[in-house]
Swiss-Prot record:
One Pfam family linked to the record: RhoGAP
Keyword Plastid: no
Biological-process GO terms, alphabetical: regulation of fungal-type cell wall (1->3)-alpha-glucan biosynthetic process; small GTPase-mediated signal transduction
Gene that this sequence comes from: rga2
Protein species of origin: Schizosaccharomyces pombe (strain 972 / ATCC 24843)
Any one annotated GO CC term: plasma membrane
Residues in the signal sequence: none
Organism domain of life: Eukaryota
PH domain ranges (all copies): 719-836
Protein name: Probable Rho-type GTPase-activating protein 2
Location(s) in or outside the cell: Nucleus
Residue numbers bearing the Phosphoserine modification: S388
Site (Arginine finger): R1106
Amino acid sequence: MVKMDVVRTTGFFLRSEPTTCRITTFAYSAEIIYFHAETTFLFEKIMKEGNELEKYSKIELNSEIWEDEEEEDNSGIVSQNERLMKLVNKQREIIYELHKDLEKVKKDNTSLRMRLSKYESTDSFPSSQPSRANSPQSDSYSSPYEKGKLFPKISLKSSKDVPTASAHISSSDHEKSSSVSLSALNNYNKTTDIKARSLDRLSDMTRPKLLLNTKRSHRSSEEPGASSPVTSPILKDSQKERIQALRNKAIKTYSVSTESAERIDSIRSDNLSPLSLNTSSFRRPITKPTPFNSDSNISIDPKDNNSNKQDHFAEIEDELRQQFLDIKVGRANASSPRRKSISIVKPHGISSPKHSTNNLSSKSGKFHSDFRVVSENVLLQARSETNSPIIENKEANNFLAPTSNVPAYSTPARPTESPPPPPISSSSTTPRPDDKPSLPPRGLSEDNDSLSLQKTGSSDTRRSSFSTLKIPDSDICFTRRRSDSNRTWTVIDPHHSQSFDNDILAEIPTSKLDNSSQKSPGKLSSKGLLNSFSPISPFSKSKSHNHHPSSQVEKSTSNSKGSMLPLDTLYNNKLSFRLDESLVRYLRFELMKTSLASLSPDFDCIGLQFVVGVSASSHLASQWKDEVWSFTRSIGECRSFATSFVLDIGAPPFPTLDWFTNDSSVIQNELLRRSVDTYFRYIFQTDLKLEQRIKLLEFLSSDTLREYLHDVFFLPPEHAQKEGVLLKYIENSGLVSRYFYLKDNILYFAENRNSPVLGTIHLKDAQVNRYNANLPIFSIIDPPHEFLTGENYQSAFVIQEKQTETRTGTATVHVLLARDVEDQKSWLRAILRQVPGSTSPLNASPFSVLSSDFPGSSRYRDQSSPIRFYGKADSRPVSQEAILSQDISSSPSPVLPPSENVASYADDSLVSNLTMSPKLRDSMEQVPLENHREFEISDRVSELSFDSSTGSVLEIADTRRNQDAPEKHVPVIEIQSSRPSLEKTDQSTPVELLIDSHSQNSQNEEKRSRMKFWAFPHHKAENYEQISDTNIPVIETNVMLSPSSTTSAEPLQKHIVRKSGIFGLPLNEAVNISTQFNDSGLPIVVYRCIEYLESCRAEKEEGIYRLSGSASTIKHLKEQFNEGVDYDLLSSDEEFDVHVIAGLLKLYLRNLPTNLLDTSMHKLFELLPNVPNDSAALGELCDVISKLPPENFALLDSLLHHLRRIIAFEKVNKMNIRNVCIVFSPTLNIPSDIFMMLILNYDHIFTDISRQTNGAQNESDSDVSDDNGEDNEFF
């Protein structure tokens, strides 16, 4: 018990120093009175809350009795009420124990008074009345010194020396107030059945505690004269030593940390009176001090200054109110990193005392402030009943004076006789922990003017001290380090000569600093706040080599106004700055991205990558440019930061190893990433203190990449040359709509307009091509499905970036799809203008193609490289000189790295030099300029043919005649080659492309179906019939295809003869062949597969379409369909697994040369967001689907109907709509969002009217109607 400790410790003084014991006992009694009043208040409050809770719980219980027992929520509510009742009972029991403790303390206090009265009856003090002891039943206690006014005057202590929480008043007054409070508490206890009503237990830190580490040694002060009828006994030296030993022992028996005292004070702050008495923080005594005497005796002054009693207590009340405000402000600034030493100034006419100064401690002072409170009624009663103010003189010793920092506002300067203080040395800025700041003794001048002057000066100094909190400029310096990127920054310790002296800053009036820091941004200099920073790291060079930082400090401190002048900043780096208070306060952080940078078996070694956006508030908006900070930290570093970074209650905790299990590494990684992201996002969004902001910047300052926000492309560029929507192919996702911006040789793309940029495409040294399925540039792409083949994608184009160390392979190839051919041409014109070296569309950068990857080209290749063909971006004619003066070799081309797809052609070079033969130059000179055909981007059509006889000459021509001038000949470029050329024939025939085949026995049907751009090097060449037309102009070259050319189905049908095979045929041809066997209107493979699956009830097979079947069986069935076209799976003698048939259906759909939705993809993307909520959009969607070709519509209708049957049994087969979309979205090359939208709106889209508009036959219409009937069966 704390009270028992008080009694035992007080007993140490009983045998040697009775007067001091009386004072101590009365002080403790005042504290007991306060704690009685406080406990009574808590008792009333908790009893009221307990009654309300009990009443509420009874009402709830009664209401629950009348409710039906069938309700499931009854048990939960009853259990909640029971818990509330248990909580209330527990609270009552614990407060009952608290009252028992208080009753015990009252008895101990009574026994202590009896012992003290017995001791006083035997002392040698003369008294006007005989001493009498107070009985335990008495309500008041009178001291023998009360009527004689023999109580000594004790001066009030300084702000850090008085440990008690109440004023030192006379014994009678104190006993009266004590008896009043105790009797009130007893009466309250009589009216309240404490045993019947138990209270909530308060925490240990709210229990009443008394301070034991108290310094109570006094010096006697005697006034010469015969007016002192009573003198205190003189203690012997042995008694002094014993008392001193007992006090030292009392210190060791009780100690309370500052943090626990702060918690106690925070809990009681709501219940304390504003008129709190804080004798531990008084800055001046109340009355005039008596002369000091070297003896440690106490002299009693019987004279009472009754005339000044009212003024005296008025000063007490003013001081109390001032101290209450100071305490509130002082707590907020208690953790200030700055510290100032106060110089002692002695004015003339005042003699200094003969003892040393007292040592103060901010730590002990804060602890004392927790016990400084006395209720207002006690103070008023003391003011009305006391007869003599108490004055206490302090003895100069180091008893109970711990070493700590002294806040500047707690120690006002005392006037002395010394001259003005000398300059404070720089060593005082960083004192050692053992240094003990000094405090002048308590003494004032004789006149009231000096008293008021000191009071005013003290308050001004105090207010100016905590009005602003300066940060030492030498703490943190953010600057760039020398590195490869030259953007890494960290903390660099500045030179000693560049650091400021904190004491010099302390001498400057803070009001001047406040005025300078509150200037508007418009009044700042050209460099703004950066001019007020200290010199930065030694990596930056100063503007003047003769200018030294020390002279700046001298110049700033010698200002006549007393304020610090802005220093000349050595600001030579855009991304370097010094930490400043205003900069720290107004910086705002936003966590943009958190990702796992590296994995490790050790939890603390896991790396995390952070991307933080740094902006400034309105105060620094004109001086700060938004930046992006990227840095990597390990889990160990983050946890150590979280341990030292104290947040409020309710903040998200930092993840620990106990959070994670061994279930799934993917889930664990995502949980770790989200937990860390949540923790730091809370830190960046909460309102941090200045010290917390400094710690946060220190955490962010190590090895951090700083870039301006617009350099990181998180925001779309302004004033773009061209912008619009394009479809972009993404691996495993298909075509995705993106919004593109073209500016400064960079193509930015975002999800929507004005949304954050997702990525960039650099056009410098890039290859730009119109889409062609045979371009070898696609050999490095290997997606799981195929698309963009044939004439249906004439609006597509491809950009291949220059490969670097960080970007290689498929990351450099971008397939883009415009709305139509005109949109494609406009984008290509804009892109060609951005290519370096091209000043206009007439001088556009050439397209380049790597031809060595084509089948059959390796046998003809030599050391030369592919040709760069020149394309035009507009329709204006090209002059002869412009074509002949083109320097092809001046435009570098990126080199494709060897890959597994082009391993056999890795030795080919990618840069070629174009040379014109004399025959070509002569032919071009003979043709008039107006008859030259433009090299249009979208008008080139190529054909493929192989020369099986010679296999040595490649011929390039244009299949389209010039309709405007049919009689003119098309000029032909001839390129030097090591191969012999064919004989030239009549040049009036159309030009065709002939390619020799290196394999005569290849399978045409398989190669036709798999001639896709990403898998082209894996396929063998197809057998084509040699064209017998000999009227073809000859061009000698080692390449075979222009990148600006595309395939056309119409001319190919005239010259290419295919073998029979259903896989890979266009959809309309496959339907025409299927009509020989059934009238379903579907390809025969689709019809047989769906028929088999539905007859075998595949919808009840778990994992249908998700599990793979036998690859050999699927290949065998594919050959059966290719050879005989129709293969009845149900009537076959062999039984097939449903997963095999499902795999066969997916294989056929994957090999379709065109997309089912064809050109309707763009319109569906526009309708996608509005379809679920807008009937008009749904009607427009039906209209778009109804305009599909009949074959596409019928296949899409049957397939979606079949998949809806699969989804209807999702509980059995585990294939919900999401899983079905995951499987068929890449198979059909339809985005999953659109595919899901088609499935969900199937009933609204595929109606009989829509089928009739597609021109379906009557039989097929009836079949489809039957399908709808089945659909109604399952939905």
